[in-house]
Amino acid sequence: MKKIISGIVVFIGAIGIGIGVFQPQEVRQITSIVDQTFNELSDKKVEHTSDQVEVKNHNKPTFSSKDLSLDKGNWQVFSDLDSLNRVGEANAMLHKSMMPTEERERLYIKPTGWKQKKMKNGDYLYNRCYLIGYQLTGENNNPRNLMTGTRSFNTPAMVEYENKVAEYLRRTGNHVRYRVRPDFRGNELVARGAQMEAQSIEDNGLSFNVYIHNTQEGYVIDYQTGSSRVQN
């Protein structure tokens, strides 16, 4: 997507250089067209891992001042499962004292849409994906904290951002406000993706706001049921 937008900008710039007659109003109109095109492309379905992570709001989280308060100390809260047994938003005020020291137990929860398949490379298509990663709080076989996600959705995508948080917590001893919002649409059993937000409290050392698309390159997922097929 970034290549497409860059191409549009280069094309417009080349026209401007070629004719050298753009007026301020025309420049504003062209900028508006580019912005509109970017928004339209951002709304389109992303099918490849190269487009799996999308930066939101210029990578700035949208927490309120109340959200960032340390009045309640360290905590984590999970939403109740909905009528379809789907997970909801998960929130936490993280600190390294919450991080586990024991080895993780084997996962056995089967989240909604769990229709496992072995891929051509021998890996399994689906992972049980934590909303709040085990390495951050030690929360394991909690059905309110596990969703069905593709292998590339889980790792490297989600895990990369979880690792950023974990490394910051260990290094600084500071707090991090954390939020993960799974993106279920209609009555679909598999989320289209998840938004991950983090903001360090005592300093500005960590901050991100990304949307990770629940896709796997080479496969088409039926988000309604969790079924999948090889992409033609």
Question: Where are the language model's segments positioned?
Answer:
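Positively charged n-region of N-terminal signal peptides that target proteins for export
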Residues: 1-4
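Membrane-embedded alpha-helical bundles that constitute the cytochrome b-like, heme-associated redox core
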Residues: 6, 34-42, 162, 225, ...
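Hydrophobic membrane-insertion alpha-helices, especially the h-region
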Residues: 7-20
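N-terminal, intrinsically disordered, polar/charged segments of Gram-positive cell-envelope systems
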Residues: 24-75
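Domain-level detector of nuclease and nuclease-like folds
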Residues: 67-232
